[in-house]
């Protein structure tokens, strides 16, 4: 079973958000990295780009497939995880430590449409 962490918010497209104050750290879940296999490239937006909940903001490529990244929240990108540009495989080592973007949240009600750890675990078991 893939690792799921309590206190995070999860989307049906297998992205997570870790909220700290007015900011959200967005990445792919352990379930997603397991399904993708060895990650070889992460396409990320630029700092100051706007992301919109439910819309694409980048992609993750692995040796098996490419997968669009769908933002679970809306806001402004304030930081990207630059380490992933040179070492994208860190996502496979720990998807939750190796977030992709940090977003200044523009509408925290976006979180109401996401799953908690229990709901996400059940979703993945379907």
Identify the residue ranges that each predicted region occupies.
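Short, Lys/Arg- and Gly-enriched loop/turn segments at beta-strand edges
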Residues: 59-70, 87-89
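Acidic, low-complexity mobile loops and tails
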Residues: 1-56, 93-126
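Residue-level recognition of beta-strand microenvironments
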Residues: 17-19, 63, 80
């Amino acid at each position: 079973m893939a690792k799921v962490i309590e206190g995070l918010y999860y989307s049906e497209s297998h992205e997570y958000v870790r909220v700290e104050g007015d900011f959200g750290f967005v990445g792919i879940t352990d379930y997603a990295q397991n399904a993708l296999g060895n990650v070889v490239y992460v396409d990320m937006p630029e700092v100051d780009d706007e992301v919109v909940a439910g819309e694409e903001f980048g992609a993750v490529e692995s040796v098996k497939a490419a997968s669009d990244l769908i933002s679970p929240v809306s806001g402004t990108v304030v930081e990207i995880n630059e380490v992933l540009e040179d070492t994208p495989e860190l996502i496979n080592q720990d998807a939750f430590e190796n977030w992709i973007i940090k977003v200044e949240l523009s509408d925290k009600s976006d979180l109401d449409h996401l799953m908690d750890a229990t709901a996400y675990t059940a979703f993945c078991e379907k």
